[in-house]
Amino acid sequence: MMRAILFGVSLAALPLAACETTGESTATAAKAPVALEDKYATSADGVKIHYVASGSGPLVVLIHGFPDFSGSWSKLTPKLNDAYRVVALDTRGYNLSGQPEGVANYAMPKLVADVDAVITAEGRQKATVLGHDWGAAIAWNYAFAHMDKLDNLIILSVPHPANFGRQLTNSPQNSDYARNFQKEGSEKNLTAEGLAGWVQDAEMKPKYIEAFKRSSFAAMMNYYRANYPAGNNPPTALAPANFPKIAVPLLVIHGMKDTALLSMGHNDTWDQAAKDTTLLMIPTANHFVQQDAADLVNGTIRSWLDARRPAK
């Protein structure tokens, strides 16, 4: 098994497809933006899952975390959709997706089924699945449940579940925020403006606020109530007894300034993989690594996918 551990900007030099010009400027030669489509899939329990789709080619599914929405991928999508079919979900409870009541409706098997419903709605048998934060937890679990439907797996920030318990044990104070989210009524402390406080992009911030106003704060907290381990207990929905090896190429990207999920959680990730495994640790990036280091993250993802795309 090939094991590649990359630090800082070591992947920045990976070649991307060059834009050929014949005298005109790069801006003139640039392709027009690919149109975005608002679409819906119906999950196994009847919940409607909204997603934004664009492009054609191998399917890439993007899954956001908390607090976020499908717009999280606004910088990545145009880097991919000239050669890939890119779909970005609003996970259940968020923005334009269904918002069922009750903790049980946010258990991991239902979140995994939502992703499967989107892939099915696209008429595909396989996809690359990419997730950040809760989206990464969903992506790991999608791999465990549907390895045969994966082309590749891309994870931002969240350790493999086998290592997650170790991180909780070694740095319990870093998960205090999650314990607070699990408390009854915690959603009453949330506002759309507060949830969007981390967003630095002036153009995107109003879009985040509007998306959060359309979302269910109770649903956001139910992700933690249904799936995050309580107290000092080991992970439950995140931790099946025996993890299957990740039998597809795996890319893991982590911002080393992340204070909720520490970089040490990714140690030994390669032991959980049966195919080539690439880890990119970015010293300057925080938890929202796809925003903090967008150029490096997006360029890496494109180059990594291109290198693993079957020859025509």
Predicted regions and their residues:
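Bacterial N-terminal signal peptides that target proteins for export
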Residues: 1-6
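Short acidic-hydrophobic surface loop/beta-edge motif
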Residues: 39-44
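Conserved HGGG/HGGXW glycine-rich cap/lid loop of the alpha/beta-hydrolase fold
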Residues: 47, 52-96
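Bacterial Sec signal peptide processing site at the extreme N-terminus
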Residues: 20-31
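Flexible "cap/lid" subdomain of the alpha/beta-hydrolase fold that forms the substrate-access gate
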Residues: 32-36, 47-49, 59, 87, ...
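Catalytic histidine-centered segment of alpha/beta-hydrolase-like enzymes
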Residues: 285-294, 298
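C-terminal motif of bacterial Sec signal peptides marking the signal peptidase cleavage site
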Residues: 16-18
